[in-house]
């Protein structure tokens, strides 16, 4: 019996281990929920072991610090033709860096993940399993003498019929299509809130790229980003996208704060100690040095020239233009007597939103690369209070505001819900975000308008192409209004591009892009405008295809005016009284539109570089000669937090700052031309509180 017992013990242990494995594997394979990730699920794709540390930080480190989930996928083995030993050393380096970011011991669980039937090495941080590193390990030598040659990844991406195989255990061979399918499956499996990748926009052919040449990147960086963006098309979802400038960031100004640079440098050092091309170990290591020292001081984002500017009336018949900088990644305003742009700071990778506060002053919103929303308010003397965070929510896209300038906004959160926010006073303070009723499959491009009864109505489309609306309910005394459940709008399938406004008959007009044709389509509110159930006219196809969002406004009589861009670098169209007219102007971005003292303004980015904006204006039926705004600054960006206003400082912050804003207005001597001048102090007026019937 003792002998039998002794023989059974190993078998028992084996069975126990097998059972434990069966129990644990599904849990290990299942992606974490949004709740487990504290609302943040980052999925970063990079070519090499260190690209994320040099080009995507401090963003990744910030999300780990916030308790978010971070999964990084390294496409190549990063072996430089030196074999597994060098690859494994670099892998140890990134693990050390991520353990440091997570404030946990450098202890990892190693196993193999799968995507699209492919086996991929996977490491999970034991002290914080929200952090995972996946290694596809595509072989990565130069296929020639070095720069000016292809790599296996860039060759497979650019040449038909090529393949790339992997280094180390679990060998795999990929075609270009198989790489895209695998990346798409990784996106679908994880369900990210943000997909991060490198710069796909560099147009220099792979075989003409050179080390540290201006504007040049690495062929693997470019190839990886192009493959990821194609994978995103195959795996759409409610997630944000952020692309990162890599090598060329060294050509731009430092835009990280000193504390960010210090932290980013130490993180990179933990990697460099394990990469013998950088350091032999911690002792005597002087990294980051050389170009790495420049990269750790910067974080810049890919811009695609398709971001519409924002327009704001200055209160005296002039127009102020705001734009996100493609070079400085900051919020910018067209400036003064010097006729140039100046920066309002911040780091943003997307568009801006402008609106009007109840006291007649301008407001701005911007989205940071972590999904946070920041607001800024202008004073009557033209200075700005400073950026304040609209905390409690991370959003996939910039919020949408009502088109007549009201300071209220709706945005799609990382949680898949639409959320509402409005000012809580006239001093620049805001309420907390309010959850709207759930809408399955909601997309990130809602529209909002104010109905005839004074209450707001929000429109949203779903991934299935359906249109819905929700309206504010009457508010109890001292309470903010709630919203009724979403109701279907009878309409053809939509592909986004929503815009809504109240017209001269106090009826809401709704516009959207029709799925299939991409035509601008119009619906007009019918029936009793006080009824919570909104009736609609038959959909009218206006026959104009367009991209992005329509710019929408109304003249003094309430007649609705829209402007759209038919395609990238295509013609602008103006829609008045339901009739589209093609303008003699082309643009790279969708337009912005405003009507100020009878003058219609349309502003859009021109094609090509550098970043410039064309200002079209029409008064009394006559178009003025177009004005071009150029010279958007290359510097001035930085973290919003260092520019943020404390609530107690809001009335006084920056009150002695110089007024740098410039106004575009019709010339007093020649109405057929536009003048550019310094923005005067705004006319003060009593605040007009929102009235709700």
Language model: regions and residue ranges:
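The feature marks non-catalytic terminal segments
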Residues: 169, 190, 194, 214-217, ...
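Active-site rim/loop-helix segments in enzyme catalytic domains that contact anionic ligands
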Residues: 30-189, 261, 270
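A structural motif
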Residues: 302-693
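Proline-aspartate-enriched helix->loop->beta-strand connector
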Residues: 179, 183-205
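Bacterial N-terminal signal peptides
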Residues: 14-26
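Bacterial N-terminal signal peptides that target proteins for export
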Residues: 1-16
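Short, flexible/disordered intra-domain loops and linkers
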Residues: 81-89, 204-219
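Short, surface-exposed basic-aromatic patches at helix termini and helix-loop junctions that form
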Residues: 60-67, 73, 188, 233-234, ...
């Amino acid at each position: 019996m003792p002998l039998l017992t002794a023989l059974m013990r190993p078998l028992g242990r084996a069975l126990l281990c097998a059972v434990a494995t069966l129990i644990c594997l599904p849990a290990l394979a299942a992606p974490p929920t949004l709740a487990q990730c504290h609302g943040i699920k980052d999925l970063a794709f990079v070519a090499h072991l260190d690209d994320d540390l040099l080009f995507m930080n401090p963003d990744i480190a910030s999300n780990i610090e916030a308790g978010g989930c971070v999964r990084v996928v390294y496409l190549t083995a990063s072996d430089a033709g030196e074999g597994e030993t060098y690859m494994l050393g670099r892998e140890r380096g990134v693990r050390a860096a991520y353990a440091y970011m997570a404030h946990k011991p450098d202890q990892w669980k190693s196993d193999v993940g799968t995507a699209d039937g492919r086996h991929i090495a996977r490491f999970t941080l034991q002290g914080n399993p929200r952090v995972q590193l996946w290694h596809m390990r595509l072989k990565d030598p130069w296929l020639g003498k070095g720069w000016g040659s292809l790599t296996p990844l860039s060759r497979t991406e650019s040449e038909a019929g090529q393949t790339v195989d992997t280094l180390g255990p679990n060998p795999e061979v990929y075609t270009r299509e198989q790489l895209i399918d695998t990346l798409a499956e990784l996106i679908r499996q994880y369900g990210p809130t943000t997909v991060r990748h490198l710069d796909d926009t560099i147009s220099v052919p792979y075989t003409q790229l050179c080390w540290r040449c201006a504007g040049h990147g690495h062929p693997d960086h470019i190839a990886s980003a192009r493959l990821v963006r194609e994978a995103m098309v195959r795996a759409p979802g409610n997630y944000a996208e952020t692309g990162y400038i890599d090598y060329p960031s060294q050509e731009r100004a430092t835009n990280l704060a000193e504390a960010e640079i210090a932290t980013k440098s130490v993180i990179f050092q933990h990697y460099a100690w394990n990469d013998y091309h950088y350091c032999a170990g911690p002792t005597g290591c002087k990294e980051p040095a050389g170009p790495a020292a420049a990269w750790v001081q910067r974080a810049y984002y890919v811009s695609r020239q398709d971001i519409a500017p924002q327009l704001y009336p200055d209160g005296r018949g002039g127009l102020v233009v705001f734009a996100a900088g493609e070079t400085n990644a900051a919020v910018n305003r067209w400036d003064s007597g010097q006729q140039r742009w100046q920066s309002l700071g911040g780091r943003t990778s997307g568009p801006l939103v402008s609106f009007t506060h109840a006291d007649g002053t301008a407001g701005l919103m911007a989205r940071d690369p972590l999904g946070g929303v920041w607001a800024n308010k202008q004073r009557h003397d033209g200075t700005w209070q400073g950026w304040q965070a609209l905390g409690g929510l991370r959003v996939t896209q910039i919020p949408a505001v009502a088109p007549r300038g009201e300071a209220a906004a709706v945005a799609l959160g990382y949680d898949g819900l639409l959320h509402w926010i409005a000012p809580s006073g006239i001093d620049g303070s805001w309420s907390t975000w309010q959850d709207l009723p759930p809408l399955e499959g909601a997309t990130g491009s809602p529209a909002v308008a104010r109905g005839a009864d004074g209450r707001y109505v929000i429109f949203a489309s779903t991934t299935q192409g359906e249109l819905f609306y929700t309206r504010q309910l009457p508010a109890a005394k001292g309470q903010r209004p709630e919203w009724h459940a979403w109701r279907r709008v009878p309409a053809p399938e939509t592909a986004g591009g929503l815009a809504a406004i109240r017209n001269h008959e106090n009826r809401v007009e709704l516009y959207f892009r029709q799925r299939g044709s991409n035509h601008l389509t119009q619906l007009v509110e019918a029936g009793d405008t006080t009824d919570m159930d909104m009736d609609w006219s038959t959909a009218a196809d206006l026959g104009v295809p367009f991209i992005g969002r329509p710019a929408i406004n109304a003249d003094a009589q309430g007649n609705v005016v829209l402007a759209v861009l038919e395609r990238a670098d295509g013609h602008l169209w103006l829609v008045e009284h339901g009739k589209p007219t093609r303008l003699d102007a082309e643009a790279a971005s969708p337009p912005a539109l405003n009507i100020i003292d009878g003058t219609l303004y349309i502003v859009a980015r021109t094609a090509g570089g550098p970043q410039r904006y064309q200002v079209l204006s029409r008064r009394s039926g006559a178009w003025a000669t177009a004005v071009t705004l150029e010279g958007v600054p290359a510097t001035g960006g930085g973290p919003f937090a260092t520019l943020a206003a404390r609530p107690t400082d809001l009335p006084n912050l920056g009150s002695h700052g110089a007024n740098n804003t410039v106004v575009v207005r019709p010339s007093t001597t020649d109405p057929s031309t536009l003048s550019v001048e310094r923005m005067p102090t705004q006319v003060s007026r009593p605040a007009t509180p929102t009235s709700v019937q």
